[in-house]
Amino acid sequence: MSSIFKSSIGKKLIMSISGLFLILFITLHMCLNLTYVFDPTNTVFAGVCEFMSLGIIKVIVPVLAAGFVIHIIYALILTIGNRKARGEVRYAVSNKAAVDSWSARNMFVLGLIVLLGIALHLTDFWANMQLKEFMGQTPDDVYGLMSGTFASPVVTLLYVLWFAAIWFHLTHGFWSALQTVGWNNQIWLKRWKVICGAYVTLILAGFAFIAIYACAKANGLV
């Protein structure tokens, strides 16, 4: 059994499963954050933030972190292996057309940009909320953080560019991961591309909308 995960296909499978897990997380994250926009009284968003401080969430955080670490490690392993193999693709796709897109050719670079964005996001929010609470300190007010962070159009633009990088990364990564886990019916190939592309676009457009709305709100435009 262990030999399976030492093989190229096994490594791709691990990276794909961890990637799908992270897609599920960002979907939930975006849906919860939308309450900031569509809750004029801020009661729902405050409830969401309170929920995020529960003990069960503190247990989930290490699992989520492990998902990121596993995905990054196997991305590095596969990228190095692919370069040594002179062009072997990162995912278990079954035809050359699957890796002809710009996103497919730049998955590793896009991944690095996404990683830098995660570091920025953790510094802006997680370090000032969950980490402070974990350290026994008083966490910052989430509304103050939203206003303080997105009041700067430059910071807002950086976040939007980060979301764009995630979009490019996932437009290829999502359906490629589905192929790797076995959903590789050629009849469905084009359909999966459309479905996954639409899904990723909806999620990342939601994130961008939240950031732009927060910027407009912080500057008194809404």
What label would you give each PLM region?
Residues 1-222:
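Membrane-embedded alpha-helical bundles that constitute the cytochrome b-like, heme-associated redox core
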